[in-house]
């Protein structure tokens, strides 16, 4: 693959960024994220319409994450020599098909099939996103392009639930997914128009994905990714009970806190390219260290609403650096195997999200209200130490 990348760069060196293609990728990512979380705000009407409980309907989110984890691991092995332009178009088609299957679902099994299609698109798209980006812009512009893509993620995360809830009341949950299918069609046409041909890896250069973990610093990097995202979900999954019981926020106050977090996350993502240009390793070590301190502050003084709100804003600003930073690390330190590294990264993140939420929930129920914070802070501190000591970083 390294020879293949080198040959392509030599023959087709990128001198000007293809921003139209980058924005089409960002739009596709935003659509994937919005559709992933639409059921969260539509569970009740979906459950009532299909004659199932809300808990069972909630598995429509779980199955997407589960399929995405496995899709991310095996998609790069499956699409080796395929032009990545056609692969991205396929993912957009799967996104659209998923929405239509869910919209017309008359049984829980058809609903799950639709959501599984989304999982394949979600996991596959994230697996190739870093390598895709580095083939659309010059090396010096990669952090900026990644910040555009992750900025779209931040916006999608902020608007997905309230938009789904509002439109669900207005036009019904099935028509919400029909509207999402229309967005998928727009994705397809935009990608067809803007994304250039991006040849895949020749079949004779296939390599085992997991051999990457034998490279110096790669295993440490993946462990650091796991701990940082597990730390995030150990806390953020339970931000509602923590903020309502520790700081005394009501529903309206919590909504404003979450909105502030979302806006801060978008701002942090927008500023990430400037910070990462200075030092990727400093950002990847510094961000979790700041989050560890924030968890400590919230544990000690979180009963003060001003302090709690400030921590939420700082958390949103700071954590935004982490996903962009690790994708930048892949494009620089593992550029010759960016797709395979991306597939491992996505699987690690999905596993971390699941483990972080599960362990955080156990701690909340069995240890105490601030235990998710202490768990999160500990994981973030360990991440900062591991990055500082073991993670290797190549200069751009």
From Swiss-Prot:
Sequence ranges on the Periplasmic membrane side: 43-54, 107, 169-175, 237-255, 303-305, 365-366
Membrane topology: Multi-pass membrane protein
GO molecular function terms listed in the Swiss-Prot or TrEMBL record: antiporter activity; purine nucleoside transmembrane transporter activity
Transmembrane domains' residue ranges: 22-42, 55-75, 86-106, 108-128, 148-168, 176-196, 216-236, 256-276, 282-302, 306-326, 344-364, 367-387
PROSITE patterns registered for this protein in UniProt: MFS
InterPro entries for this protein: MFS (IPR011701), MFS_dom (IPR020846), MFS_Efflux_Transporters (IPR050189), MFS_NepI (IPR023680), MFS_trans_sf (IPR036259)
Gene Ontology CC annotation, any one: plasma membrane
Role played: Involved in the efflux of purine ribonucleosides, such as inosine and guanosine.
Name the record gives this protein: Purine ribonucleoside efflux pump NepI
Annotated source species: Escherichia coli O6:K15:H31 (strain 536 / UPEC)
């Amino acid at each position: 693959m390294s020879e293949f990348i080198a040959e392509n760069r030599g023959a087709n060196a990128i001198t000007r960024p293809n921003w139209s293609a980058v924005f089409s990728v960002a739009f596709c990512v935003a659509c994937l994220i919005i559709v992933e979380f639409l059921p969260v705000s539509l569970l009740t009407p979906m459950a009532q319409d299909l004659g199932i409980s809300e808990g069972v309907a909630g598995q429509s989110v779980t199955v997407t994450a589960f399929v995405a984890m496995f899709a991310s691991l095996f998609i790069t092995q499956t699409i080796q020599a395929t032009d990545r332009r056609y692969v991205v178009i396929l993912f957009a088609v799967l996104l659209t098909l998923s929405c239509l299957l869910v919209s017309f679902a008359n049984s829980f099994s058809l609903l799950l099939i639709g959501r599984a299609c989304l999982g394949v698109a979600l996991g596959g798209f994230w697996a190739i996103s870093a390598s895709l980006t580095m083939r659309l812009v010059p090396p010096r512009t990669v952090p900026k392009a990644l910040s555009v893509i992750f900025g779209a993620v931040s916006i999608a995360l902020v608007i997905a639930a309230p938009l789904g809830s509002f439109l669900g009341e207005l036009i019904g949950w099935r028509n919400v997914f029909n509207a999402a299918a229309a967005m998928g069609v727009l994705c397809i046409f935009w990608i067809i128009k803007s994304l250039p041909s991006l040849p895949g890896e020749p079949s004779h250069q296939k390599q085992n994905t997991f051999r990457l973990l034998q490279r110096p610093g790669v295993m440490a990097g993946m462990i650091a990714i796991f701990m940082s995202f597990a730390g995030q979900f150990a806390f953020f999954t339970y931000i509602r009970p923590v903020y309502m019981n520790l700081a005394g926020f009501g529903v309206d106050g919590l909504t404003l806190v979450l909105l502030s977090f979302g806006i801060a996350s978008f701002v942090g993502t927008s500023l990430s390219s400037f910070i990462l240009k200075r030092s990727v390793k400093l950002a990847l070590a510094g961000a979790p260290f700041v989050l560890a301190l924030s968890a400590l502050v919230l544990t000690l003084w979180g009963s003060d609403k001003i302090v709690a709100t400030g921590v939420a804003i700082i958390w949103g600003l700071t954590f935004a650096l982490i996903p962009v930073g690790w994708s930048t690390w892949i494009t620089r330190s593992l550029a010759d195997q960016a797709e395979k590294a991306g597939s491992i990264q996505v699987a690690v993140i999905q596993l971390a999200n699941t483990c972080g939420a599960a362990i955080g929930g156990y701690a909340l129920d069995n240890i105490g209200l601030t235990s998710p914070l202490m768990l999160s802070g500990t994981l973030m501190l360990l991440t900062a130490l591991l990055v500082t000591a073991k993670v290797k970083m190549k200069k751009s």
